[in-house]
C-alpha cells in the first residue's frame, strides 16, 4: 500500500519537473517527433536491439516497436523511429532480491520515468529471467510491474509496458511467475519462443535439437490462454540466431549425414540436458559458415518433427563433426503463420541486429518472413532512413 500511495507523489514530482523541459532539448527538426507516440493498441512487430549503430539499416516501414538494450541512443534514431510511428522502449531488468524493498522500488520507478521522459521515448520492456519459485516473490514481481505500469500510464496513457516471458508459463527454467497477473498489468507479453531446449527432461542421452519448434510454440500459447490470458496480449518472439553443438559424441558413426547428434550433458536448473552444451551464433555467421568453401559441410537438412533446418560440418581445426540448428525464412514463416492463425498480438525478434545488412539476398527474406504476419505486409525493398 505504501508503494501505491507514494507512486502518486512520484508521478506528480516527475511530471512537474519534466513539463518545463519536455519541449526543450528536442534533437529532431520537428518538435512533435519528441512527443511519445499516441497510437492505440495495434498489431506488433517488435525488434530487440543490442547494437546502437545498425538502425539506419532497419526496415522502418515494417517495425512497430524497437526495444533498446544499450545505454544511449543516437538523436537520429529517435527522429527516424517516431517519423515512422515506431515506438522506442527501453529494455530493463530488476534485481529480484529487492522486490520486497519498497523504498528501492519507488526510487527505481522514478528513475525509469525520468529516463523515458528525458530521452523522449515511449516506455519499458521488462526482461526479468531470474528463477522464481516462491509464490510470494512472484506476486511481488507482479506488484512491481503493476506499480510501474500505473505510474507510466498516469503520465501518458500511450506509454507502453511489455514483459518478456518464457515460451510457456509452466515454470520453464524455474521461472514460476504470476503470468496472468503480469498480462493484466501490462500492454502485452512477449513469449520467447526460442531457447526451448534450455531444459530437456527424459533423455537418457543428451542430443542436439531445434531452438524454436512450432509444436512447442503452440503448446506454450495454449498454456498461456489456459490461464485466461487473451491471445491479443501475446506476442510471439522468434530467433534470428541458432546453436552450434560442437563434437557430436557418436563415435565412429559421426559424419556429415548424422541426424541425431549426441552431446555433452550440461545441467541447467534441474535438467541434466540443456542447450548450454552448445553456443549461440547469429544468423549472419551461420550463413557465412554454410557458404565457406573451405569447410566441408552437408547441405541444409529439414527436420519434419520440429519443422526446423539443421546441417553438419567438419570442424577444420579439430576434425570433429559439429551440428547446427537454426531458423531460416522457411521455418520462421511457419511460426508466423501460426501466430496469425492464433490471432496473436504480433511477432518479435531476438535480435534485430543478427543479420548482415550488406547481404540483402539473405537478410531481406528474414525480415519479410516476420512482416508476413501483417495482412498486407509492407515491402522491404528499401529501408527508410
Curated annotation (Swiss-Prot):
Positions glycosylated per UniProt: 51, 101, 223, 272, 296
Residue ranges of domain GH18 in the record: 16-377
Signal peptide: 1-15
Record's function text: Involved in the degradation of asparagine-linked glycoproteins. May hydrolyze of N-acetyl-beta-D-glucosamine (1-4)N-acetylglucosamine chitobiose core from the reducing end of the bond.
This protein's record includes keyword Glycoprotein: yes
Broad class of the protein's primary localization: other
Gene Ontology cellular component annotations, sorted alphabetically: lysosome
SUPFAM superfamilies the UniProt entry points to: (Trans)glycosidases
Taxonomy, superkingdom: Eukaryota
Any one GO MF annotation of this record: chitin binding
InterPro entries noted in UniProt: Chitinase_II/V-like_cat, Chitinase_insertion_sf, DIAC_cat, GH18_Domain-Containing, Glyco_hydro18_cat, Glycoside_hydrolase_SF
Annotated localization: Lysosome
CDD domains: GH18_chitobiase
Keyword annotations: Glycoprotein, Glycosidase, Hydrolase, Lysosome, Signal
Pfam families: Glyco_hydro_18 (PF00704)
Protein name per UniProt: Probable di-N-acetylchitobiase 2
PANTHER family found in the cross-reference section: DI-N-ACETYLCHITOBIASE
Family note: Belongs to the glycosyl hydrolase 18 family.
Active-site feature positions: 129
Keyword Magnesium attributed: no
EC primary class: hydrolase
EC nos: 3.2.1.-
GO terms classed as biological process: oligosaccharide catabolic process
Amino acid at each position: 500500500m505504501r508503494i501505491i500511495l507514494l507512486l502518486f507523489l512520484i508521478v506528480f514530482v516527475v511530471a512537474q519537473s519534466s513539463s518545463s523541459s519536455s519541449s526543450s532539448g528536442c534533437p529532431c527538426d520537428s518538435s512533435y517527433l519528441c512527443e511519445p507516440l499516441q497510437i492505440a493498441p495495434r498489431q506488433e512487430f517488435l525488434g530487440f536491439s543490442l547494437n546502437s549503430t545498425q538502425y539506419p539499416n532497419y526496415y522502418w516501414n515494417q517495425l512497430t516497436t524497437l526495444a533498446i538494450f544499450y545505454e544511449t541512443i543516437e538523436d537520429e534514431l529517435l527522429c527516424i523511429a517516431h517519423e515512422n510511428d515506431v515506438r522506442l522502449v527501453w529494455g530493463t531488468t530488476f534485481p529480484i532480491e529487492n522486490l520486497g524493498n519498497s523504498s528501492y522500488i519507488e526510487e527505481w520507478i522514478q528513475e525509469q520515468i525520468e529516463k523515458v521522459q528525458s530521452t523522449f521515448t515511449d516506455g519499458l520492456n521488462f526482461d526479468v529471467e531470474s528463477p522464481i519459485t516462491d509464490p510470494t516473490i512472484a506476486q511481488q514481481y507482479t506488484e512491481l510491474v503493476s506499480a510501474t505500469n500505473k505510474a507510466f500510464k498516469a503520465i501518458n496513457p500511450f506509454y507502453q509496458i511489455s514483459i518478456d516471458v518464457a515460451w510457456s508459463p509452466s515454470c520453464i527454467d524455474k521461472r514460476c511467475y504470476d503470468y496472468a497477473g503480469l498480462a493484466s498489468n501490462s500492454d502485452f507479453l512477449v513469449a520467447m519462443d526460442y531457447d526451448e531446449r534450455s531444459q530437456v527432461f527424459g533423455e537418457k542421452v543428451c542430443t542436439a535439437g531445434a531452438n524454436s519448434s512450432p509444436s512447442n510454440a503452440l503448446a506454450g500459447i495454449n498454456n498461456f490462454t489456459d490461464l485466461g490470458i487473451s491471445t491479443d496480449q501475446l506476442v510471439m518472439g522468434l530467433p534470428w540466431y541458432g546453436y552450434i553443438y560442437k563434437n557430436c559424441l557418436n563415435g565412429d558413426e559421426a559424419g556429415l549425414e548424422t541426424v541425431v547428434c549426441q552431446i555433452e550433458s550440461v545441467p541447467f536448473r534441474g535438467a541434466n540436458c540443456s542447450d548450454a552444451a552448445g553456443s549461440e551464433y547469429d544468423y549472419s555467421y551461420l550463413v557465412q559458415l554454410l557458404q565457406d568453401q573451405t569447410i566441408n559441410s552437408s547441405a541444409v537438412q529439414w527436420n519434419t518433427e520440429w519443422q526446423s533446418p539443421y546441417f553438419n560440418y567438419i570442424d577444420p581445426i579439430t576434425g570433429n563433426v559439429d551440428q547446427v540448428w537454426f531458423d531460416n525464412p522457411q521455418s520462421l514463416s511457419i511460426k508466423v503463420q501460426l501466430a496469425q492463425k492464433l490471432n496473436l498480438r504480433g511477432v518479435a525478434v531476438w535480435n534485430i541486429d543478427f543479420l548482415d545488412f550488406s547481404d540483402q539476398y539473405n537478410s531481406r527474406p528474414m525480415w519479410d518472413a516476420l512482416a508476413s504476419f501483417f495482412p498486407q505486409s509492407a515491402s522491404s525493398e528499401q529501408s527508410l532512413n
